[in-house]
């Protein structure tokens, strides 16, 4: 079973979803009404929100963040390489790689929030009324649409992470040799994000 499905099963009484209100049930909404984006939280707040009783953020958001950290390390190595003494002729090469890496990092950070939003949409779809056949039909259609969107998020995380592997490979071959351990950590972060995203599909 996917992590998302396990979350749903953890709610023992499905009728409980009928009263699902993200403003009162999603912990980060309760903590900060004006600043809901996970990407704007501090590291400590993000960790505390993740460890709370709220089912979101969950594995999908963590996968995206793991990939973002890997991409960030790759960008760091490109910056260190671009400014390495004696490598002035390589500045443009590493700068272009760094720019691409920043775009990847930004996209993965966005996916942290998109995954949590997708899960919240599923919960809201389940909370729709089902008193008549028409309401049940509309509810089912919304559940299907929300679930499809939720599945597409980990696909996107994997796609973006594969792009970052190209950058990491270049840093391993041509980057500052003093940063090779950082390149290794970047690679493992991104590979972990890919494998973790696969779990959610």
Model-assigned labels for residue ranges:
Residues 8, 12-41:
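Long, contiguous binding/interaction regions
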Residues 52-75, 179-196:
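Conserved phosphate/anionic-ligand binding catalytic regions in large, soluble enzymes, centered on
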Residues 77-85:
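Transmembrane signal-anchor/signal-peptide helices with a preference for the extracytoplasmic
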Residues 84-94, 133, 176-180:
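Short, surface-exposed loop/turn segments at secondary-structure junctions
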Residues 85-128:
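A structural-propensity feature for long, helix-poor, extended segments
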Residues 115-188, 192:
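Amphipathic alpha-helical interface segments
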């Amino acid at each position: 079973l996917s992590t998302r499905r396990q979350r749903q099963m953890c709610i023992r009484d499905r009728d409980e979803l009928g009263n699902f209100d993200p403003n009162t049930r999603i912990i980060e909404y309760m903590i900060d009404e004006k600043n809901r984006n996970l990407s704007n939280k501090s590291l400590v707040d993000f960790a505390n929100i993740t460890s709370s009783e709220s089912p979101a953020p969950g594995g999908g958001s963590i996968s995206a963040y793991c990939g973002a950290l890997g991409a960030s390390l790759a960008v760091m190595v490109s910056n260190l390489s671009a400014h390495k003494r004696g490598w002035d002729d390589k500045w443009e090469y590493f700068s272009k790689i760094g720019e691409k890496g920043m775009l990847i990092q930004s996209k993965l950070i966005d996916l942290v929030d998109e995954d949590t939003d997708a899960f919240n949409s599923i919960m809201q779809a389940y909370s729709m009324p089902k008193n008549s056949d028409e309401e049940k039909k509309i509810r089912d259609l919304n559940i299907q649409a929300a679930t499809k969107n939720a599945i597409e998020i980990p696909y996107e995380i994997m796609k973006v992470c594969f792009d970052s592997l190209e950058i990491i490979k270049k840093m391993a071959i041509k980057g500052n040799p003093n940063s090779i351990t950082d390149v290794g950590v970047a690679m493992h972060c991104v590979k972990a994000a890919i494998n973790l995203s696969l779990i959610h599909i």
